[in-house]
Design a protein with these regions (language model features):
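Glycine-rich Rossmann-fold phosphate-binding loop(s) that bind the pyrophosphate
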Residues: 12-13
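Aromatic pocket-lining residues of Rossmann-like dinucleotide-binding sites
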Residues: 23
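Rossmann-like NAD(P)-binding element
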Residues: 57-117
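Rossmann-like NAD(P)(H) cofactor-binding subdomain of soluble oxidoreductases
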Residues: 91-157
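N-terminal Rossmann-fold NAD(P) dinucleotide-binding loop
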Residues: 16-17
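C-terminal substrate-binding/catalytic lobe of Rossmann-fold NAD(P)-dependent dehydrogenases
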Residues: 137-143, 152-317
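Conserved N-terminal Rossmann-fold NAD(P) cofactor-binding segment
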Residues: 37-74, 308-315
Length: 317
């Protein structure tokens, strides 16, 4: 018997529904369950998504439906996508109080089931919500992580491609730290083809003329532009979640920045932050420690300090 790949998504709003759509269209899940406090909405989203299964873009006949937390007892992957959208002018950290209340409600349901799979969290503030849930549930760090700086890294690839003329898939680049304002570009690790970005800048005057500060600002402002213009972000982050789910189901050993609990890596403990990881069938299978510059180390430490402070607050609520 072939195993059915079952994914449960908590939160059937903009992000959760698009994660489901990405899974349906990519064929990366066989059984998809939507859970939402608004049960009629979850049922309606599931019905609408089920209509897609008949379409030409769907690779196979995935089953999708609304359900309850008991569905987690035999689920492979749990995606946390609950919470409201970020408002214009608001940072992800500004969502802390509302999101922690929702997280604690979700935790009360999780404690009533026997979930043994892998959790991928998207709900903002992403690093904090994910690690808060992990600690309350006493889950192993490898099976409880969040999309972290995936969006920042996607945006960085877009910005670098536009600035250099190289296609995105030829560029290796990512951001580290908080999924938020204290994230930063790891310039020292960027490679295009077989060359480092620093080497290419030394060889090409037009690349040397690029302002790294301006490029990083473009990465950071992208989310604000999207939220100001449409009220949310949904497509990119859903794609990132689907990519991670695929890496787990296919044991791809994908190297990608995710937010996971740190135990001495990069000199940090008692915090979860975005770092390059190896993702496979066991979730986070390895944390890759890069040789950061002194400035990059300082930025990462500062980002971790911010996250640690909010995690301490979450523990007291």
């Amino acid at each position: 018997m072939f195993k059915t790949r079952k994914v449960v998504i908590v939160g059937a709003g903009h992000v959760g529904s698009h994660v489901a759509l990405a899974l349906i269209q990519s064929g990366e899940a066989d059984d998809i369950v939507l859970i939402d406090i608004l049960k009629e909405k979850a049922a309606a989203q599931a019905l609408d998504l089920d209509d897609c299964v008949s379409g030409a873009l769907c690779g196979h006949d995935a089953k999708i439906r609304a359900g309850e937390y008991s569905e987690l007892n035999d689920a492979d992957i749990l995606v946390m996508a609950f919470g409201r959208s970020r408002r214009p002018g608001e940072t992800r950290l500004d969502m802390f109080d509302d999101s922690i209340k929702m997280a604690n409600e979700v935790i009360s349901h999780l404690k009533q089931v026997d979930f043994k799979g892998i959790m991928i969290s998207i709900s903002n503030p992403a690093d904090i919500i994910c690690e808060h849930i992990r600690r309350k549930m006493n889950w192993e760090p490898n099976r409880c992580f969040c999309t972290g700086t995936s969006l920042e890294s996607y945006r960085l690839l877009r910005v670098l491609s536009a600035a250099t003329g190289y296609r995105r898939k030829s560029i290796q680049a990512f951001c580290m730290g908080e999924h938020g304002n204290s994230s930063f570009v790891v310039w020292s690790a960027i490679r295009i083809g077989s060359k480092s970005f620093a080497q290419l800048r030394a060889e090409r005057p037009e690349l040397a003329a690029l302002s790294l500060d301006d490029l990083q600002l473009q990465v950071k402002r992208a989310g604000d532009i999207e939220v100001d213009g449409k009220g949310c972000t949904e497509f990119g982050i859903a794609n990132a979640a689907c990519m991670l789910i695929k890496a787990i189901f296919h044991d791809q050993k994908l190297i990608w920045p995710c937010s996971t609990a740190l135990n001495g890596e990069y000199g940090q403990k008692n915090v979860a932050a975005g770092v390059p990881c190896v993702i496979g069938k066991n979730g986070i299978e390895e944390i890759l420690e890069l040789k950061l510059t002194e400035e990059e180390h300082a930025k990462f430490a500062a980002s971790c300090d911010i996250l640690r402070g909010f995690l301490d607050r979450a523990a007291s609520l």
